[in-house]
């Protein structure tokens, strides 16, 4: 069954998590957001009503599972179920920020692997494939039993630092897990710049203790590269040790600006000169906080999935 004559098969929907990004992606596609209502009953249950006919259509639903994570996750699952039951030809879950990605392994034998469970739930709800950006660990790609498009924001983040003198900067990974990301950023911004790494410990969740740093940042403008800013504790600790090691200044960039309560205030009082994040999660630029747009990367991924453009690579290999 095909859509009516003259009607594109593409439908782009948004939940409540980040309608601004969804609208930007739709505009990049020369499309309008399709009609859907996602509301909450008085008892807290979520209701989804799809107003556009999705039968035999190619549906893309854009919904980061950012805070409140559980609410936005349930919204996404219910939307996928609604599309599937209404006869959509294909349902692609576009999840710019994948909540639960930091629970990708067990630290004790009696913990769940929450990131894997969420991947399973997406498949059960009706997702045909998933598009996401900068998962915490590359190994998480194996959690999905569906086709996965894993995008990376580094080219857009690097563009925010295009004006720096490559001879005067140093790139810093705030922990061992961010080294590959920092090295990839270095190749985009300043291929000859030194790369440093901060060694940290977490005595308790959301607490950070820096133990050491490797790499020469003396007299240089340091740029810390990470995937997520949550409490700001990691960035603050890394910035402090970088300055103690003789850096002239320190800035930071990350894909996902989660910004837990109090994080903005922590970073506003920090020595960081610039903090650059993307709009995978809704956040308003203010002061030293800058927000760059990744809508074009998602739009290009959608075009590639639909076979409309195949010559441009949108997913890079960053662990």
Question: What is each model feature region?
Answer:
Residues 1-319:
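PRPP-associated nucleotide enzymes
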């Amino acid at each position: 069954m095909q859509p009516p004559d003259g009607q594109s098969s593409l439908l782009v929907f948004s939940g409540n998590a980040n309608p601004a990004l969804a609208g930007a992606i739709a505009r990049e596609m020369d499309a309008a957001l399709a009609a859907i209502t996602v509301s909450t009953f008085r008892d807290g249950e979520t209701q989804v009503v799809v107003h556009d006919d999705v039968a035999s259509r190619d549906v893309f639903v854009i919904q980061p599972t950012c805070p409140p994570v559980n609410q936005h996750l349930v919204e996404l699952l219910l939307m996928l179920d609604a599309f599937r039951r209404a006869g959509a030809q294909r349902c692609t879950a576009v999840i710019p920020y994948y909540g639960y990605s930091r629970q990708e392994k067990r630290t004790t034998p009696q913990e769940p692997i929450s990131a894997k469970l969420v991947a399973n739930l997406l498949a059960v709800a009706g997702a045909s494939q998933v598009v996401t950006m900068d998962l915490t660990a590359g190994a998480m790609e194996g959690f999905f039993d569906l086709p996965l498009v894993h995008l990376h924001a580094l080219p857009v983040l690097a563009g925010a630092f295009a004006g720096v003198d490559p001879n005067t900067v140093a790139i810093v990974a705030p922990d061992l897990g961010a080294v590959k990301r920092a090295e990839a950023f270095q190749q985009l911004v300043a291929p000859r710049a030194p790369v440093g790494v901060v060694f940290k410990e977490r005595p308790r969740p959301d607490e950070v203790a820096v133990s050491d740093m490797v790499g020469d940042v003396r007299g240089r403008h340091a740029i810390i590269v990470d995937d997520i800013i949550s409490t700001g504790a990691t960035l603050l600790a890394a910035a402090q040790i970088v300055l103690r090691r003789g850096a002239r200044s320190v800035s930071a960039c990350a894909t996902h600006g989660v910004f837990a309560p109090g994080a903005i205030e922590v970073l506003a009082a920090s020595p960081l000169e610039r903090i650059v994040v993307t709009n995978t999660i809704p956040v308003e630029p203010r002061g030293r906080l800058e927000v760059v747009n990744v809508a074009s990367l998602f739009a290009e991924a959608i075009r590639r999935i639909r076979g409309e453009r195949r010559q441009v690579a949108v997913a890079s290999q960053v662990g």
